[in-house]
């Protein structure tokens, strides 16, 4: 349970997000069956969120906080750190495990 991180390509290994910092990422979100439900890459616009402000689901934040600058990783988020039993009607089914391909582009 929780978030599992699998490195796709390593980052600098030194610069990690700190609480209150803004993470600038590109991501693609998929269901376990591979169905894409969202992607900042498709919009060609990086996504920004602040660490520690609950602006994203828990698993996404926990995973990104462990990534170093420039790293690209696959985050597998179990329902307890995603949308849980409720899901997100019309997009995420109840009790769904979500997979994100996340690249940490910058910290502000």
UniProtKB/Swiss-Prot annotation:
It catalyses: [protein]-peptidylproline (omega=180) = [protein]-peptidylproline (omega=0). Its EC number is 5.2.1.8. Keywords: Cytoplasm, Isomerase, Rotamase, Sarcoplasmic reticulum. Residues 20-108 form the PPIase FKBP-type domain. Pfam families: FKBP_C. It is found in: Cytoplasm; Sarcoplasmic reticulum. SUPFAM superfamilies: FKBP-like. Its main location: cytoplasm. Has the potential to contribute to the immunosuppressive and toxic effects of FK506 and rapamycin. PPIases accelerate the folding of proteins. It catalyzes the cis-trans isomerization of proline imidic peptide bonds in oligopeptides. This is Peptidyl-prolyl cis-trans isomerase FKBP1B. It comes from Homo sapiens (Human). The lineage of its organism: Eukaryota, Metazoa, Chordata, Craniata, Vertebrata. The gene is FKBP1B.
